[in-house]
């Protein structure tokens, strides 16, 4: 006698899009109008209990020589998340991404990512006394982790393009001698490929220097770790 197996119903991408589109949560980034459209981010608990973030966009596009008529920016962010994940750069886990035109032929687009459990903005970590609590050895390891993630990104010719300190998140796992710092990069909407790794590195690191509060000593440590991971010196980072 054959064994009958109950198959899970197949859900189309269009049905998943509609499901995520109708879900509502807490606004963590209120909808704002730019790029000729609207974009905002909500946080909510999915049906499986997972904390997720949904970026919801209407008519929010960018143009390039490949896409002269406009393309939803979440598709560029999806490409970056997938590309950086493949390079072992710590970024949010992609759950779903989709874009479709509505009846008026305007773009609707979604990007759904899993929350980075336990991660906080690095400046909030500093403000809460994380450096003092865990000590300088762990802080050096944090800088080393940040440098490694950035170097792997740039060696793949990816440029973050909006590398402000508020987009660097940190988590410490364990206590005492067993404590370990982990770093993640967020807000990849403007991330793009460059012709050379050096061009990507120079742009992002100069931008991070301008938009961070690292002391001169900490910055020099970060640059040292970065150049060791990148494999060569980058001029003009002092």
Residue ranges and their predicted role:
Residues 1-12, 17-19, 26-27, 137, ...:
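Soluble, non-transmembrane catalytic domains of enzymes that act on hydrophobic metabolites at membranes
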Residues 18-122, 151, 155:
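Conserved ATP-binding subdomain of kinase catalytic cores across diverse folds
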Residues 40-46, 52-54, 148-193:
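Active-site acidic catalytic loop and adjacent metal/ATP-binding pocket
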Residues 59-64, 128-133, 200-206:
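Short glycine/proline- and charge-enriched loop/turn segments
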Residues 69-72, 138, 200:
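Alpha-helix N-cap and loop-to-helix initiation/capping positions
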Residues 83, 87-90, 119-161, 165-166:
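Conserved kinase catalytic-core helix
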Residues 92-95, 166, 206:
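A short, local hydrophobic-aromatic micro-motif
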Residues 177-238:
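C-lobe/activation-segment region of protein kinase-like
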């Amino acid at each position: 006698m054959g064994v009958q197996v109950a198959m899970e119903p197949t859900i189309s991408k269009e049905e998943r899009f509609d499901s995520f589109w109708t879900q509502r949560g807490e606004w963590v980034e209120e909808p704002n109008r730019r790029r000729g459209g609207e974009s905002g981010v909500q946080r909510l608990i999915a049906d499986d209990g997972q904390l997720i973030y949904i970026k919801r966009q209407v008519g929010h596009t960018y143009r390039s020589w490949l896409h002269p008529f406009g393309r939803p920016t979440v598709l560029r962010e999806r490409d970056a998340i997938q590309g950086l994940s493949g390079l072992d750069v710590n970024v949010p886990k992609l759950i779903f991404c989709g874009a479709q035109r509505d009846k008026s032929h305007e773009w609707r687009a979604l990007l759904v990512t899993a929350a980075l459990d336990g991660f906080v903005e690095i400046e909030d970590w500093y403000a809460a006394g994380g450096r003092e609590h865990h000590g300088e050895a762990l802080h050096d390891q944090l800088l080393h982790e940040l440098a490694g993630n950035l170097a792997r990104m740039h060696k793949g010719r990816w440029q973050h393009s909006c590398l402000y300190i508020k987009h660097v998140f940190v988590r410490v796992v364990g206590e005492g001698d067993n404590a370990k710092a982990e770093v993640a990069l967020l807000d990849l909407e403007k991330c793009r490929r460059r012709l050379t790794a050096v061009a990507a590195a120079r742009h992002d690191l100069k931008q991070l220097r301008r938009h961070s509060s690292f002391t001169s000593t900490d910055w020099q440590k970060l640059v040292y770790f970065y150049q060791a991971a990148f494999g060569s010196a980058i001029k003009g980072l002092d």
